């Protein structure tokens, strides 16, 4: 893959774009603003990934030596300029959508830079920041499409799921993080406590997620797919409680990603647009 595309982590960026598309399904709006908001989210997320790799070049040499900067396919200086250009483009497009969307993009961009520079290595603070930004993608879509209430609730669940995965990823990367002098949760409080906290976030998300149906945000079509996601999260929670070694953490991290994907599919299935198309409720 071209290193300038790879460093964006396009799969993660597309996952962020899906939040906007899900809000479009909920509102039933599919116009230029949806397309532009999707491009904004992809660009800003990609920029955040680039600046993250810029500041993480030393630790990635241990944990992720195949990434573009530690592998030498992109210089650190070029990556820094690349991220600035991407952040600027995302901000300009955000202001084209409106003052509030533009301010959200600018503030998110600044937070992503500060996260990569200072917050990432701090116990839980970095995890909370990236989880907040993930949930904010839903809220951004809700602001653009005029459905803020639902977007906040969906963003909350995205926050819970992301918190679980971020903690598990820290467990997976504990060796390199310790060598870099980071103070992530597994380093400061141990792997066992980290596993318990990650499992707790998965359990909270699993047990409360049916409320989105009860509140009338989604139709009954939401429930069957949601149950699959809950099964994945519960299995992942049990696994991380039973073992906290790197291999288990790596597997659980992948399972959480699958669970998040299934949750997003459940959001889509229960949306007003899909319900109207199927004639089911």
UniProtKB/Swiss-Prot annotation:
Entry keyword annotation includes Metal-binding: no
InterPro entries referenced in this protein's UniProt entry, alphabetically: DGGGP_synth, Prenyltransferase_related, UbiA_prenyltransferase, UbiA_sf
Transmembrane segments: 7-27, 32-52, 72-91, 95-117, 128-148, 193-213, 214-234, 258-278
CDD domains: PT_UbiA_DGGGPS
Record field: catalytic activity: sn-3-O-(geranylgeranyl)glycerol 1-phosphate + (2E,6E,10E)-geranylgeranyl diphosphate = 2,3-bis-O-(geranylgeranyl)-sn-glycerol 1-phosphate + diphosphate
Annotated localization: Cell membrane
Gene Ontology terms describing biological process: glycerophospholipid biosynthetic process
Enzyme type, top EC level: transferase
PANTHER family registered for this protein in UniProt: CHLOROPHYLL SYNTHASE, CHLOROPHYLL SYNTHASE, CHLOROPLASTIC
Function: Prenyltransferase that catalyzes the transfer of the geranylgeranyl moiety of geranylgeranyl diphosphate (GGPP) to the C2 hydroxyl of (S)-3-O-geranylgeranylglyceryl phosphate (GGGP). This reaction is the second ether-bond-formation step in the biosynthesis of archaeal membrane lipids.
Name under which the protein is recorded: Digeranylgeranylglyceryl phosphate synthase
Source organism per UniProt: Methanothermobacter thermautotrophicus (strain ATCC 29096 / DSM 1053 / JCM 10044 / NBRC 100330 / Delta H) (Methanobacterium thermoautotrophicum)
Lineage of origin: Archaea, Methanobacteriati, Methanobacteriota, Methanomada group, Methanobacteria
């Amino acid at each position: 893959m071209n290193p300038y595309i790879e460093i964006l982590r396009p799969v993660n960026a597309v996952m962020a774009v899906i939040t906007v598309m899900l809000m479009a399904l909920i509102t039933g709006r599919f116009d230029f603003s949806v397309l532009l908001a999707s491009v904004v989210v992809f660009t800003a997320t990609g920029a955040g990934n680039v600046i993250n790799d810029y500041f993480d070049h030393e630790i990635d040499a241990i944990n992720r030596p195949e990434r573009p900067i530690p592998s030498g396919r992109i210089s650190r200086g070029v990556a820094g300029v690349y991220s600035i250009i991407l952040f600027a483009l995302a901000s300009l497009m955000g202001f084209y959508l409106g003052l509030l969307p533009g301010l959200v993009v600018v503030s998110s961009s600044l937070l992503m830079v500060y996260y990569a520079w200072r917050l990432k290595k701090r116990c839980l603070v970095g995890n909370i920041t990236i989880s907040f930004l993930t949930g904010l993608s839903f809220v951004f879509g809700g602001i653009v499409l005029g459905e803020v209430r639902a977007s906040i609730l969906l963003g909350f669940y995205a926050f819970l799921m992301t918190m679980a995965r971020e903690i598990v990823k820290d467990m997976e990367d504990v060796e390199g993080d310790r060598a870099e002098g980071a103070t992530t949760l597994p380093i400061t409080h141990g792997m066992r406590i980290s596993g318990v906290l990650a499992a707790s976030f998965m359990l909270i998300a699993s047990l409360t997620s049916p409320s989105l149906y009860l509140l009338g945000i989604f139709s009954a079509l939401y429930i069957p797919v949601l149950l699959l996601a809950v099964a994945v999260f519960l299995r992942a929670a049990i696994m991380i409680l039973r073992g906290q070694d790197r291999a288990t953490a790596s597997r659980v991290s992948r399972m959480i990603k699958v669970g998040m994907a299934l949750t997003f599919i459940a959001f889509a299935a229960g949306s007003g647009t899909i319900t109207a198309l199927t004639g089911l409720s």
